[in-house]
């Protein structure tokens, strides 16, 4: 999606998460993302909100489809692997966070072993952004103010 103007940061959600090939229980993983959006947008107008994601198969594209179905504007920011090589992921992650979202949502079944999702979460925390993390065998943590062993 091409954007003609910068969205209001108080209405921006950044999503990061696990790659599709690594998700063990797709049905429950998708349900977790749906539940997040339903809770976050309860009694709000979804069309006023923008989702920014990193265009990765898995959590990013699941969240993008769910957000689109709910009526949010969806913006994908892909990593430029050809231009930046291995640095492309972290560069893309920082670009997403520079929109200063009101929340960064991370969906991962094992975030401590993650590279990309963990990089986004740690960078967001360093930027003093609100981060919501959900992963298997741990309740959603709400707003994180420390890296919780990430």
For the regions a language model picked out, list residue spans one by one.
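Acidic/glycine-enriched connector segments
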Residues: 2-144
């Amino acid at each position: 999606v091409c954007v003609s103007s910068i969205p209001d940061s108080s209405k921006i959600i950044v999503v990061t998460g696990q790659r599709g090939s690594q998700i063990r229980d797709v049905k429950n993983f998708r349900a977790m993302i749906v539940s997040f959006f339903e809770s976050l947008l309860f009694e709000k107008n979804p069309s006023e909100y923008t989702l920014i994601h990193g265009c990765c198969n898995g959590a990013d594209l699941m969240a993008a489809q769910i957000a689109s179905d709910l009526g949010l504007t969806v913006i994908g920011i892909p990593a430029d692997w050809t231009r930046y090589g291995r640095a492309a992921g972290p560069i893309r992650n920082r670009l997403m966070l520079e929109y200063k979202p009101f929340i960064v949502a991370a969906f991962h079944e094992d975030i401590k072993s993650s590279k990309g999702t963990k990089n986004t979460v740690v960078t967001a925390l360093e930027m003093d952004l609100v981060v919501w993390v959900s992963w298997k065998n741990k309740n959603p943590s709400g707003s994180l103010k420390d890296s919780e062993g990430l």
